[in-house]
Regions:
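Gly/Ser-enriched beta-turn/beta-hairpin loop segments
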Residues: 3-16, 60-66, 73, 117-130, ...
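Glycine-biased strand-turn-strand hairpin within the trypsin-fold
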Residues: 1-32, 40-46, 53-54, 75-77, ...
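Short, surface-exposed secondary-structure boundary micro-motifs
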Residues: 1, 37, 95, 101-102, ...
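Short conserved beta-strand and strand-loop elements enriched in small hydrophobics
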Residues: 44-50, 96-100, 269-275
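C-terminal recognition in membrane/secretory proteostasis and scaffolding
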Residues: 22, 58, 72, 91-94, ...
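Active-site loop architecture of trypsin-fold serine endopeptidases
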Residues: 16-17, 42-45, 79, 99-113, ...
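Active-site substrate-binding loop(s) of clan PA
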Residues: 48, 58-60, 77-105, 137, ...
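Short, well-ordered loop/turn sites that connect or cap secondary structure elements
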Residues: 26-27, 39-40, 84, 90, ...
């Protein structure tokens, strides 16, 4: 367990603004995971270990939409990493343990249960979260959500509360999704992967749609029913009533699978789609553009 002190500087030392967040080590070489919003706009990041040691952190990269950042402790020491579990295996009612530094209170463990496995559409990103009634408060962000075996199943991210303090409705990023994001960050060292959009509306097709469009009953995917003008999808050749079967080599079983791949690729990346159009299988490579909710920010 560790605390982060990200500093943004004004014109003088007195203008220094600091914030506190949490994080955890994922590699014996000292690679550390936290939330992107914990270190956003920071010029200096300090890591305080549970044994009191303080290290300056080196920024490795981040993924803005996923709200994940990867840091490195600049030391030749070997560190003990957290064990990353399998968030697909959790069940509603399982014990959930949040570790962090709420309000700067170090080494705080709070206990609750998994309230929901795949809570969707909590914010503009559409990202899926684990919901828990485990107490998560300011300063807990970026810390691990553990199962009863001490395995990391999520990264504590945010709460739903009218007061700003825990009301028993907290949300964590599933660790399996985080693993995929971290691989993407490792391929874009030194960069912040910014949000992108495809610009389609899609849904699981009804039996009548399958029959009229020649989509096999056993085919898995989503049906495009509308495309935004001047979007990446339109410019990349995607059409209304295309049936999307895969994205970047992975099956698309639900619209959230497609959203996840768009998010992982990020702004400026290329999304490779496998589609069915008029009973013919095709592949499209679509350069992604900036997400509409990010424009002007």
């Amino acid at each position: 367990e560790m605390i982060f002190h990200p500093y943004a500087f004004g014109e003088s030392r007195e203008d220094r603004i600091s914030s506190i967040g949490s994080g955890f080590i994922i590699d014996e070489r000292g690679f550390v995971v936290t939330n992107y919003h914990v270190i956003k706009n920071a010029e200096i990041i300090e890591i305080i270990m549970s044994d009191g040691r303080i290290f300056p952190a080196r920024y490795v990269g981040s993924h803005e939409r996923a709200d994940i950042a990867l840091l490195k402790i600049p030391s030749e020491d070997k560190f003990t990493p957290a064990f990353l579990g399998n968030s697909d295996e959790i069940e509603v009612g399982d014990w959930a343990i949040a570790v962090g530094s709420p309000y700067g209170l170090e080494k705080t463990f709070t206990v609750g249960v998994v309230s929901a496995k795949s809570r969707e559409d909590l914010d503009e990103t559409g990202q899926t979260h684990i919901q828990t009634d485990t107490a998560i408060n300011p300063g807990s962000s970026g810390g691990p959500l553990l199962n009863i075996y001490g395995e990391v199943v999520g990264i504590n991210r945010m709460i739903r509360s009218s007061s700003g303090a825990s009301a028993g409705i907290g949300f964590a990023i599933p660790i399996n999704y985080a693993k995929r994001v971290l691989r993407q960050i490792e391929q874009n060292v030194g960069q912040n992967i910014r949000p992108a959009t495809l610009g389609v509306m899609a849904t699981t097709p009804l039996p009548d749609h399958r029959k009229s469009l020649g989509i096999p009953n056993d085919a898995v995917g989503v049906l495009v029913y509308d495309i935004e003008p001047n979007s990446a999808a339109e410019k990349g050749g995607l059409r209304r009533y295309d049936f999307i079967e895969g994205a970047n080599g992975l099956s698309v079983r639900h619209i959230n699978d497609l959203r996840e791949q768009v998010g992982l690729v990020g702004l400026g990346g290329v999304l490779r789609l496998k589609i069915l159009r008029d009973t013919q299988e095709m592949e499209l490579s679509i350069p992604l553009v900036e997400a509409a909710y990010q424009k002007g920010k």
